[in-house]
């Protein structure tokens, strides 16, 4: 026992060489810590670090410095110096242009008075307490898209720059502009600039645009926190270049959209177009997420109210064409929030326009609905599809759409018999 205690509890007498080695080790450790601390102080004062300009303080104003467009409305502007660096750019004060038919007063709009006044005070503290300006330039544009034809429906599809396969799959399926006989559809993909600063990818996008003429792109960074800018880009494009469009759908690149059902059962081309019409999957009574670790986090100083106004899931909503200009203009007086669907709902509340429920609560789905030709022939949206899945299920639906439920029942009975035999 005594021997064990000496071995494990008591220090043996150290030689001079051992002491010197131990001192050298400790000295190296201390110097390493000092060096790391000095490096931290050095990098912490340089604005060019990617981590330095995070999205939390001003999540929607990140763009590229050094961009020079020779002609902002042409399809393929010069991209020289576009990949040099990213910097935050403060929104410039600008008086919002009010429509004569639009009441921009927040009075009487439930849950907005305190929010808008709080936004104003925060803006003044940070130097951005003014109506938003919208100054993002076009890199790719399609200004003549509605001059060549008079579409009944525009599909605004939010896509990431690198989602080339998703765009290809959508063109082959629900985004096919010749899908509905006698009904003109226009497809537009909404893009920002890749955060990876990939010159090869940008050249591929330019070539894709030359081939299909269905991409618009502006000079903001394409990130989750800039989805609101992406949607406003689409709204402004519709208001500017397709002001007389009857209907618009905004959706995402990972969605399954039954375009034929949308047109024939919801929009009904034989009827006069509606006005101030907005529908989708209604989100009613939702409270702001105050968990700072959540990507849906909403700081109380940006939105102090306890409930959001009614809004529609951003995975897919449909609105009358006249609302594009109204939503864009009213947005110039409301601070941009990174939750795009919530923000559009706030704009509608300020316009005193209530989203209306669809005829069937199951037609808009912000989750993935298990596939059957019967179910998918009676819905408008389903979420989270890979490009290969989209093509597979779309082709199956087209083959069975005239007797979708009968064929689905036969397939189910066949699978049941197969399992029983085996």
Swiss-Prot record:
Where does the protein end up?
Answer: Golgi apparatus membrane
Q: Does the keyword Ubl conjugation apply?
A: no
The keyword Transcription regulation belongs to this UniProt entry's keyword annotation: no
Q: What is its EC number?
A: 2.4.1.86
The annotated topology with respect to the bilayer is: Single-pass type II membrane protein
Q: Which residues form a coiled coil?
A: none
Name of the protein in its database record: Beta-1,3-galactosyltransferase 2
Example GO BP? lipid metabolic process
Record's catalysed reaction(s) = an N-acetyl-beta-D-glucosaminyl derivative + UDP-alpha-D-galactose = a beta-D-galactosyl-(1->3)-N-acetyl-beta-D-glucosaminyl derivative + UDP + H(+); a beta-D-GlcNAc-(1->3)-beta-D-Gal-(1->4)-beta-D-Glc-(1<->1)-Cer(d18:1(4E)) + UDP-alpha-D-galactose = a beta-D-Gal-(1->3)-beta-D-GlcNAc-(1->3)-beta-D-Gal-(1->4)-beta-D-Glc-(1<->1')-Cer(d18:1(4E)) + UDP + H(+); a neolactoside IV(3)-beta-GlcNAc-nLc4Cer(d18:1(4E)) + UDP-alpha-D-galactose = a neolactoside IV(3)-beta-[Gal-beta-(1->3)-GlcNAc]-nLc4Cer(d18:1(4E)) + UDP + H(+)
Q: What InterPro entries does the database record attribute to this sequence?
A: B3GT2_N, Glyco_trans_31
- Gene Ontology cellular component list: Golgi membrane
């Amino acid at each position: 026992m005594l021997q064990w205690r000496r071995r494990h509890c008591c220090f043996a007498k150290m030689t001079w060489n051992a002491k010197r080695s131990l001192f050298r080790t400790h000295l190296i450790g201390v110097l390493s810590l000092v060096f790391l601390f000095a490096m931290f102080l050095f990098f912490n004062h340089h604005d060019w670090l990617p981590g330095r300009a995070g999205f939390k303080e001003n999540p929607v104003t990140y763009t590229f410095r050094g961009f020079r467009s020779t002609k902002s409305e042409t399809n393929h502007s010069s991209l020289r110096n576009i990949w040099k660096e990213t910097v935050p750019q403060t929104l410039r004060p600008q008086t919002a242009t009010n429509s004569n038919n639009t009441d921009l007063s927040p009075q009487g709009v439930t849950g907005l008075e305190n929010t808008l006044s709080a936004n104003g005070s925060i803006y003044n503290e940070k130097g951005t307490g003014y109506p938003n300006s919208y100054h993002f330039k076009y890199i790719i544009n399609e200004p003549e898209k509605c001059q060549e034809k008079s579409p009944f429906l525009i599909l605004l599809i939010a896509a990431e720059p690198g989602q080339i396969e998703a765009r290809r799959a959508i063109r082959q399926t629900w985004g096919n502009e010749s899908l509905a006989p006698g009904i003109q559809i226009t497809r537009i993909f909404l893009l920002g600039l890749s955060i990876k600063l990939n010159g090869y990818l940008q050249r591929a996008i330019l070539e894709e645009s030359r081939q299909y003429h269905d991409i618009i792109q502006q000079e903001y960074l394409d990130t989750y926190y800039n989805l609101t800018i992406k949607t406003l880009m689409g709204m402004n494009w519709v208001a500017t270049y397709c002001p007389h469009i009857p209907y618009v759908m905004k959706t995402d690149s990972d969605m399954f959209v039954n375009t034929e059902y949308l047109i024939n059962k919801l929009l009904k081309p034989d009827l006069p177009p509606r006005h101030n019409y907005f529908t989708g999957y209604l989100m009613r009574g939702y409270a702001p997420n105050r968990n700072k670790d959540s990507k849906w986090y909403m700081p109380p100083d940006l939105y102090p109210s306890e409930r959001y106004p009614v809004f529609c899931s951003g995975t897919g909503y449909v609105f009358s064409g006249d609302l594009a200009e109204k939503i864009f203009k009213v947005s110039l007086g409301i601070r941009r929030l990174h939750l795009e669907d919530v923000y559009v709902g706030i704009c509608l509340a300020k316009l005193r326009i209530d989203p209306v429920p669809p005829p069937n609560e199951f037609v808009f789905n912000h989750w993935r609905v298990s596939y059957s030709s019967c179910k998918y022939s009676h819905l408008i949206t389903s979420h989270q599809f890979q490009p290969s899945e989209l093509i597979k299920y779309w082709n199956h639906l087209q083959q069975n759409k005239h007797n979708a439920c009968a064929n689905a029942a036969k397939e189910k009975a066949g699978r049941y018999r197969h399992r029983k035999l085996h």
